[in-house]
């Protein structure tokens, strides 16, 4: 419960689906989304370039691609609803954009959980200048 409170406090001021996405990540991984994923590797967080450093960073690359496939939506600001059924994330009823954004976030949160065993603390707060190569295509 304390972790949930810390995440809620850290996310005050964060708008739109970033709040829901953070709560999904916490629920799937048990990790604080801000400290564990906001600056991880070359793709987690704002922007991204180069080659993903590992499977977790690849989750972020795929998530960026998913958002990129939503040109008529605003993935970082459009809010959506979701709930859990038997532990699984279920996107709620909403607009087409809300549902597609939710599905992008859901897939990334599940990807993070599936790759917890290979999460590498070396890539937390990874410096951008080490992500030199041109980005892969989605």
UniProtKB/Swiss-Prot annotation:
| Gene Ontology terms: cellular component | extracellular region
The cross-references to PROSITE patterns, in alphabetical order and at most eight, read: PA2_ASP, PA2_HIS
Q: Which residues form the active site?
A: 63, 105
| Cofactor list | Ca(2+)
Location of the protein in the cell: Secreted; Host cytoplasm, Host cytosol
PANTHER family (alphabetical): PHOSPHOLIPASE A2 FAMILY MEMBER, PHOSPHOLIPASE A2, MEMBRANE ASSOCIATED
Indicate what this protein is called per its UniProt record: Basic phospholipase A2 ammodytoxin B
Q: State the species of origin.
A: Vipera ammodytes ammodytes (Western sand viper)
């Amino acid at each position: 419960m304390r972790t949930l409170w810390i995440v809620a406090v850290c996310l005050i001021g964060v708008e739109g689906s970033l709040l829901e996405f953070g709560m999904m990540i916490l629920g799937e991984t048990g990790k604080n989304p801000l400290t564990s994923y906001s600056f991880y590797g070359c793709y987690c967080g704002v922007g991204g370039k180069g080659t993903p450093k590992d499977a977790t960073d690849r989750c972020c690359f795929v998530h960026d691609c998913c958002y990129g496939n939503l040109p008529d939506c605003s993935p970082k600001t459009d809010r959506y609803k979701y709930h859990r059924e038997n532990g699984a994330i279920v996107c709620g009823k909403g607009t087409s954009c809300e549902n597609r954004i939710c599905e992008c976030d859901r897939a990334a949160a599940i990807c993070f959980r599936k790759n917890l065993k290979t999460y590498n603390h070396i890539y937390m707060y990874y410096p951008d200048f080490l992500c030199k190569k041109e980005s892969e295509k989605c």
